[in-house]
């Protein structure tokens, strides 16, 4: 009888543990990442705040990132693929939160980052652009239409790939 009760308790503990682990990893689910980290970004339809590299008249992908950010570095291959596929139809601007120009230049050269880079070379939370665009997570991406309005925001490059495919369907 004791073995049966012990076995039942052990099974219950295993089920509860597995259930708890499942809910803890839900935040890791790509569908939920934007809910967690992109919720306070500029709203769709908002005029994109001006900065020297941003020009109206073309679609623009803004990629807020830093060389010291592991998630950003992991997304670079996806951003490179986007740039290669859509770089003639949209302008890509990397908005770097790096403080050292030489480190940024070395990283972009070593990793084949060919799109324009913009940086204030200040600490992330001290930059005007991060305040203007309400950046609280890196990486963060914005899609700006030719009229200068925000049309999409995400913290996942793979989601931006899907959005660009909707806007620029293959012929």
What would you call each of these model-derived segments?
Residues 1-27:
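Bacterial Sec-dependent N-terminal signal peptides
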Residues 58-60, 64-68, 137:
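Short pre-active-site segment immediately N-terminal to redox-active cysteine/selenocysteine motifs
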Residues 64-81:
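Conserved redox-active cysteine motifs that mediate thiol-disulfide chemistry
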Residues 76-80, 101-105, 130, 161-164:
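Extracytoplasmic/secreted envelope proteins and their assembly/folding machinery
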Residues 82-125, 135-138:
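Conserved segment of the thioredoxin-like fold in thiol-based oxidoreductases
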Residues 113, 121-167:
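Thiol/disulfide oxidoreductase modules built on the thioredoxin-like
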């Amino acid at each position: 009888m004791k073995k049966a009760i012990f076995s039942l308790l052990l099974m219950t503990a295993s089920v509860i543990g597995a259930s708890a682990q499942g809910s803890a990893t839900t935040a890791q689910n790509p569908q939920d990442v934007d809910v967690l980290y992109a919720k306070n970004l500029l709203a769709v339809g908002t005029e994109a705040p001006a900065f020297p590299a941003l020009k109206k008249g073309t679609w623009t992908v803004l990629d807020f990132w830093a060389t010291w950010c592991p998630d950003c570095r992991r997304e670079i291959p996806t951003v490179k693929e986007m740039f290669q596929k859509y770089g003639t139809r949209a302008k890509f601007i990397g908005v770097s939160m790096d403080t050292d120009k030489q480190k940024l230049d070395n990283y972009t050269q070593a990793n084949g980052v060919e799109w324009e880079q913009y940086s204030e070379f200040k600490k992330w939370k001290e930059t005007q652009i991060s305040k203007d665009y309400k950046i609280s997570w890196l990486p963060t991406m914005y899609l700006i239409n030719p009229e200068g309005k925000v049309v999409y925001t995400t913290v996942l490059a793979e989601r931006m790939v899907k959005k660009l495919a909707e806007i620029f369907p293959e012929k």
